[in-house]
Amino acid sequence: MSETPDSPRPVTPGSQASFGTYGGRPVSFVRRGTRLQGRRQAAWEEHAERWAIQVPRHVANTSVHPDYTFDAEAVFGRKAPLIVEIGSGLGDAVVHAAEQNPDKDFLAVEVYTPGLANTIIKINSRGLTNVRVVEANAPEVLESMLPEGSVSELWVFFPDPWHKARHHKRRLIQPAFASVAAKALVKGGYWRIATDWSNYAVHVREVLTGSTEFENMHEGERSGEESPLTQVWQSGVESVVGGAPVREGRAPVSTEHTGPNEGVDEEGGWAPRFDGRIRTSFENKAHEAGRMIFDLTYRKR
């Protein structure tokens, strides 16, 4: 069974969002809304006890007490491959995957409470039993909540790109995060990543190329003129954030590539679209803005 500490430290609502740090380290999110209304409120009150993992907190409202361990076999009532999605949003991807893969179990990790409520609504409407949700800070989930080598796949789709240079330290995928991801994954487990920003795609590729714990499953593929990065650089579609006209009175935010004709991506390493990743409303907005989607797939050595 899961181990629950006797007396978790009190929660400090909003502390992580306010200061942007936890345990002296930057966090990758801002909690923009936690209030529930209507269907979301009703779903949370009626079903959260069953579908939401009630973790003991540590020092903040999304922290996980370091003594707590998630026992997937006890929670799901069986031993099955566990897939974890970090930043599950409204739950479209994880719920679809759970429906298509009844032989696997899924854990949706999110800090946006309305998104988790939406996920619970979808779980109930489809009669699924192989999905759970947890409101928690992702690095803590991977570092201490999940047992070492317990995750068969890790998904991070469209993380916040944190465009401004002074905010790059808040990007989720950093060397330290790669280390805790490797700790949670089984040997040979997959880490699937998608982003609609070329600058973040390059950042991810650099971080994981520098990791000795992962190998790129598509090393050298889709390079040169076939690279989506080359296409973005040469088109100049990301000359300002959004690839669209800047609103009146607002300054453009550079993504560090102003195009056109900036060069050719000779490194490549981009994966084909993962069949299990459905096109969500969030991704649709990226396409409408003219941005390209970058997929990367790594395997734990």
UniProtKB/Swiss-Prot annotation:
Catalytic residues (positions): 160
InterPro entries documented for this protein: SAM-dependent_MTases_sf, tRNA_(Gua-N-7)_MeTrfase_Trmb, tRNA_methyltr_TrmB_bact
Gene Ontology molecular-function annotations: tRNA (guanine(46)-N7)-methyltransferase activity
Pathway: tRNA modification; N(7)-methylguanine-tRNA biosynthesis
GO cellular component: a single term: tRNA methyltransferase complex
Residues annotated for substrate binding in this entry: 164, 196, 280-283
Region (Disordered): 1-26, 244-270
Record keywords: Methyltransferase, S-adenosyl-L-methionine, Transferase, tRNA processing
Binding site for S-adenosyl-L-methionine: 85, 110, 137, 160
Broad EC category: transferase
EC number(s) stated in the UniProt entry for this protein: 2.1.1.33
Catalytic activity: guanosine(46) in tRNA + S-adenosyl-L-methionine = N(7)-methylguanosine(46) in tRNA + S-adenosyl-L-homocysteine
Superkingdom, taxonomy of origin: Bacteria
The family this protein is said to belong to: Belongs to the class I-like SAM-binding methyltransferase superfamily. TrmB family.
Protein function: Catalyzes the formation of N(7)-methylguanine at position 46 (m7G46) in tRNA.
Record-given protein name: tRNA (guanine-N(7)-)-methyltransferase
Organism from which the protein derives: Paenarthrobacter aurescens (strain TC1)
Gene: trmB
